């Protein structure tokens, strides 16, 4: 990745988008932390025969995560849960909410040509493609796929909002000649309204379970635990993402080596630590790298280890 990709490269964020969808579902009253959604391994829109399968679906049938709360939907990365949330929210409420995190606009303070990314709406699709918006478009956005596009800088800005418990600090890329930003006329941070402190704390906790939850059976373990959660000396909050680059017919069996490298999935991981009082937030994108937990998460841990442990920053 070249430096311009940080601010202008456009990518599907995959499951790293789920924390923001979850917060939107809380804000709009679609869910709470106790609601359970049945995940049999697939989702079906009302009146439709098409099955939208979860990543846990096993060829020949079966799979799924059982009864899923928002917290479990995070640490097991249940597509079915977030299909449900986005469908019930609807695209207008969903797109309006996530834009508050900087998605769909230039969220950088000092990079004029940074891309705005794309948070799609029915009006955008009609103008761009002269086509109607379908419910399937909405639920694809709910898992960070479809027409949705973000830059790595936007995702970094957004994850710091969660780390700051709702406080949006505009990102900046330029320092003065002395390597300082202290004298720059920066806009004041803003607080995303309507979300209680408890919901921010619960989302942070759910993201820590992505990394640290173990010893409860495979179907309850955090998706990143095996990759980075063992013997970690501080509490990290994170979320993995594996984003499709090209559409592959559902149910098709294939190996990554069957695809041209540029068509292979992108690996993402977003993280911050220490979770209780964050000192650093990290976004890792490995273009065409494969699974986020296996490929991108170890890079994120290496970066955070270097900052917190080797620089002697307090980790409590």
Provide a role label for each language-model segment.
Residues 1-15, 20-284:
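Beta-lactam-recognizing serine transpeptidase/beta-lactamase-like catalytic domain environment
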Residues 155, 292-304:
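Short, charged, low-complexity patches
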Residues 180-191, 299-316:
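Short, gly/Ser/Thr-rich active-site loops of penicillin-recognizing serine hydrolases
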Residues 287-290:
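A generic structural motif
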